[in-house]
Amino acid sequence: MSQYASRSDSKGALDSSSPEAYTEDDKTEEDIPAPSNYLWLTIISCFCPAYPVNIVALVFSIMSLNSYNDGDYEGARRLGRNAKWVAIASIIIGLVIIGVSCAVHFSRNP
């Protein structure tokens, strides 16, 4: 007998069902976490009275989700970040509009 493994044993190590075939460096689609698409934030921003801006945020968020599903992880991350900032801008614009409306309404003399 030789001290080396036979060809059938070394071939079994390359089989995909063996635990030796999987390494930590192998990344599959299930291993990559989904980037944030901020859908919840864009839905909340839709309740603010800045309608063109918050609809754009919602579109960015949905595009981010679609990009992730298509396998474009960098595009999904970029679109999610855009959705976040546009939603924040929409909320700020909405709060300013509400504040100005309240100031005008309550500053009038009865």
UniProtKB/Swiss-Prot annotation:
Residues 107-110 are extracellular. The keyword Cytoplasm does not apply. The chain crosses the membrane at residues 86-106. It is a single-pass membrane protein. Probably expressed in nociceptive neurons. Detected in dorsal root ganglion neurons. Signal peptide: none annotated. This is Transmembrane protein 233. The gene is Tmem233.
